[in-house]
Amino acid sequence: MIAFLLTLSIASWAQQSETRSLNSFRGVKVSQAIDVYLKKGDKESARVEISGGQTSDVVTEVEGSSLRIKMRDSRNFWSKVNVKVYVTYVNIEKISASSASSVFSEGQIKADHLDIGVSSAANVEISVDANSVMVDTSSAGEAVLEGKSPKLEVEASSAGDVDTYRLESETVVARVSSGGEAKISVSKDLEAQASSGGDIRYRGNPGRTNTHSSSGGSVKKSN
């Protein structure tokens, strides 16, 4: 009997995987400590890998134009498992990560405009090639971007962190507050505002700069 229960216990903690077909979507929204890996393809799908639970514990459903990825049980159960979801997208315009989740790109994400939101200790690390990018981090969320985007808009608050030193941008608008931090590279036009302990560091030699700092905020050129 003990051996049987031990076998069941080991089986429940073994890694399980499942590949799912998905309806069309243009955005991805992930939460609850799930790691998501994005890859471009010809048809939308998701491969779920889980240790310490069942694949049925992981929800991958398209709501409107967004793919929602979360745990079926909203209680603290999800903190005891390890979940990775490999998402194949056709086109993507929006990425949202919260509650200690992470999003990574396998290859460069190409888009006209890309909207990125990161909050509650979540993390986004991606490579992009887009005409414009909007990044908003808060509550210890972190975004690290590389690649190219002529137009970049950054907002960071409540200890949110944005690092785009490796993202080539021509025009940048950055607003940082409440202990937020932004690191940016800009070549032509910079508008930067930092307040309430917010910190902005920029690289490059923009032809025009319009900066403002208040309440302990800081905007400085970096080496």
Spans of features found by a protein language model:
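Intrinsically disordered, low-complexity terminal regions
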Residues: 1-223
